[in-house]
């Protein structure tokens, strides 16, 4: 008798995606981050749902409602900090997942890659709006500064900003709509994840060598299910340690002060996971130029497949490209550090240099190095 998981209309979809899926036998731990992102998304949706049950999106009571969650709701402090630090864990996994794709040439699956870029933008938008919701000082001023950047768009900029604000400043209308969108977007992200997986399963997974592995496939279950579960345990242990021992490590102390439009914090900065893009934004003196550089710092991922000039897919056997890749990683760490520093010497020039190098490596040095490697290998 045929197993029900292979005949049932719903179960056979799950079976072909997570049980009998043929997977390359050589996948390393770098392939764990996709499933870890799924766990992060589930944690965020669940904790967010429970937070939304107690949260009020009215400027008069918002800050107090968050305090109430932490003090009076059963395990409210745990739910709140799991949600806040879960976002950090989400972005750590997200950046490692994108880095894996760049290193091993997974971007040659263009549909999967492009849906992934859409996912990245959607998650960033969700995180930005979520940061506004506690209505602390950094929430308010972060929202004011970042939304104000849209005023750099010629002709329609000012009207666009006021339309997003729902008035002439960030206020009750802004908070209410940000809460609505922050609640809605994770479900759109979930739908996009399904599209992402659909396109991935059309082509099959890449592997560390970048060489087609059709002749050497193994079933996803039990091999990779066990491996993924180990990844879940490690990540959830790290998240639990962060939440239980130093929940405010990655947050900003200014956000424990209620939002005050009359008092500007000394250093306005976003959460740590946006600092690299914020540093690129600040490194250009012109407002519109800065906004374009900010968008391009992430949108540049969309043209990476076009810039692939190597005859090999993966960087596994390309030491020169590997050096450039790790230099790019170092530059991203530098930009993250600079984004959190005040705008003064020597941070300004360091940020500008790192920003130029970031674009230079991706747009020019990597394609040229790939061509040089082709020549050296006589391909």
Swiss-Prot record:
Binding of a ubiquinone, residues: 201
Location in or out of the cell: Mitochondrion inner membrane
Segment forming the signal sequence: none
Chief location: mitochondrion
Function, as annotated: Component of the ubiquinol-cytochrome c reductase complex (complex III or cytochrome b-c1 complex) that is part of the mitochondrial respiratory chain. The b-c1 complex mediates electron transfer from ubiquinol to cytochrome c. Contributes to the generation of a proton gradient across the mitochondrial membrane that is then used for ATP synthesis.
Oligomeric form and interacting partners: The cytochrome bc1 complex contains 11 subunits: 3 respiratory subunits (MT-CYB, CYC1 and UQCRFS1), 2 core proteins (UQCRC1 and UQCRC2) and 6 low-molecular weight proteins (UQCRH/QCR6, UQCRB/QCR7, UQCRQ/QCR8, UQCR10/QCR9, UQCR11/QCR10 and a cleavage product of UQCRFS1). This cytochrome bc1 complex then forms a dimer.
Protein name in UniProt: Cytochrome b
Gene this chain is encoded by: MT-CYB
